[in-house]
Amino acid sequence: MADDMVYQEAVAAEVIQVNGRTGVTGEIFQVRCKILGGKDTGRILTRNVKGPVKLGDLIMLRETEREAKQLGKRRK
C-alpha cells in the first residue's frame, strides 16, 4: 500500500502582507503571498495559513490555483 502513494510537488511562496486573523479563536492568518516557483511564478495570492506567520516568511503551497475569500468586517 505504501508503494501506491503519490507525492505532490510543493511551490514556495513569500509572505508579503499579513491581512488579519480568522477562525473561531484567531488561529488562522490571512496573508498575501508571492509565488516564487512553478508555472505561476510572480503571481500574488491571498491564502489562509494556520500557525504563526510574519512578513518575509516562506510558505510551501501544494496548489497555486485556489485563493482565499477576503475577510469580512467584524460585527460587535
Swiss-Prot record:
Q: Which family does it belong to?
A: Belongs to the eukaryotic ribosomal protein eS28 family.
Organism in which the protein naturally occurs: Methanococcus maripaludis (strain DSM 14266 / JCM 13030 / NBRC 101832 / S2 / LL)
Query: Where exactly are the transmembrane stretches of this chain?
Result: none
The name this protein goes by in its record: Small ribosomal subunit protein eS28
InterPro entries with a match to the protein in the record: NA-bd_OB-fold (IPR012340), Ribosomal_eS28 (IPR000289), Ribosomal_eS28_CS (IPR028626)
CDD domains linked: S1_S28E
Name the source's superkingdom: Archaea
One annotated GO molecular function is: structural constituent of ribosome
Q: What is one Pfam family matched by this protein?
A: Ribosomal_S28e
According to its record, what are the GO cellular component terms? cytosolic small ribosomal subunit
Arranged from A to Z, the UniProt key words for this protein are: Ribonucleoprotein, Ribosomal protein
Could you tell me the Gene Ontology terms of the biological process aspect for this record? maturation of SSU-rRNA; ribosomal small subunit assembly; translation
